[in-house]
Structure formats: structure tokens, C-alpha cells
């Protein structure tokens, strides 16, 4: 990934973030796949970036101290309830301030490391508060930007619920923005 971007992890205090996402971001930075970035963890629990990173550290296989130091300087935490529209509007202001601080161009990846029951509320609040709107960010001075959203498996508990979730998120995002993944598919 050559583009500068902000990575927003919703569900930042959970196991997926601790065991998989933070170690993966560490590896991307260590392997020079991303250079100019920042990470905003979002969760309902009271936390902070230092605590999230501390809990993740033991899951990084080949810890690079310089990379870890970079991650410590570029990781932030924002407490918000996934069902609170006002909290998400404050998150928009927070993300803009982080993008400005790190001179990021408005490219955003939203990673929903949450239960599928939260997907609709999160997608609606991201959209309602302008967090995913590329056109709005262009008006704010970000020339050319993109938004991606990652939905982590399980994607519903059966076919009916998966279709319902898919219908909801397609009201908010274009198909080219959506990534549905299963991190276990890569395991041997």
C-alpha cells in the first residue's frame, strides 16, 4: 500500500485487534508496506493506545523496536458507543485532527473488528457523520481520497442475516469500498 492513510479500527479493545490487527500493522510498517499512516482505535471501553499496544506486543512474532516506536507515536484511541450518533460525529472531528497532524490526505480504512450485530449501526453512524464521504472530504481540502471498509467474519449467523447485513451496508458503501474477510482462511 503506497497511499498515505488513516486506519480506524472499530472494536479496538477486542481480541481480534490485540492478536491479529496490531501485529499485522506492525509487520506492514516493518516491511515498509506503509510509511505515512496513523491508527485510531475506537471502542466502547475506557482505554488508551499504550494499553492496547501493551496487550498486543506479545502477539508480534518478530518485534522490531524501531517499528514499535513508530506505532506508539501514531496510535490513538477514541472512546465511543457504536450506537451513539453524537460520538461518531465527534470521531469525525478527531480523525480530521489526526489526519492534519500527520499530513494525511483523507484516505481512510475502517476495520470493523466487532460482532456482526454492530455492523449496521456502525455503518449508519460512519455515513451519517461524514466519516466515509469522499465528496465531503474533498470539500474540506482533501484533493483526491478514498475510503475502504473491512467487515470481519462472521458476516451474520446464517444466510438470511448475512443478506440483511449486506443490504444495510450497501446502502452506505459502494461495492468497490467493501471488503469482507475471514482472517482464518489464510491459516494452514
Each language-model region and where it sits:
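Secretory/organelle targeting and membrane-embedding segments
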Residues: 1-151, 155-188
Amino acid at each position: 500500500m503506497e497511499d498515505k492513510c488513516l486506519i480506524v479500527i472499530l472494536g479496538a479493545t477486542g481480541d481480534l485487534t490485540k492478536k491479529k490487527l496490531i501485529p499485522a500493522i506492525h509487520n506492514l510498517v516493518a516491511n515498509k508496506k506503509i510509511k505515512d499512516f496513523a491508527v485510531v482505535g475506537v471502542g466502547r471501553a475506557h482505554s488508551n493506545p499504550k494499553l492496547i499496544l501493551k496487550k498486543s506486543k506479545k502477539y508480534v512474532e518478530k518485534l522490531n523496536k524501531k517499528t514499535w516506536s513508530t506505532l506508539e507515536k501514531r496510535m490513538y484511541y477514541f472512546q465511543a458507543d457504536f450506537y451513539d450518533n453524537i460520538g461518531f460525529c465527534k470521531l469525525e472531528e478527531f480523525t480530521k485532527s489526526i489526519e492534519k497532524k500527520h499530513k494525511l490526505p483523507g484516505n481512510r480504512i475502517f476495520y470493523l473488528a466487532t460482532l456482526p450485530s454492530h455492523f449496521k449501526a456502525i455503518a449508519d453512524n460512519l455515513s451519517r457523520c461524514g466519516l466515509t464521504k469522499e465528496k465531503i472530504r474533498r470539500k474540506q481540502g482533501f484533493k483526491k481520497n478514498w475510503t475502504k471498509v473491512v467487515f470481519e467474519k462472521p458476516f451474520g449467523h446464517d444466510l438470511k442475516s448475512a443478506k440483511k447485513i449486506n443490504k444495510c451496508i450497501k446502502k452506505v458503501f459502494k461495492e468497490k469500498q467493501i471488503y469482507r474477510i475471514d482472517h482464518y482462511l489464510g491459516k494452514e
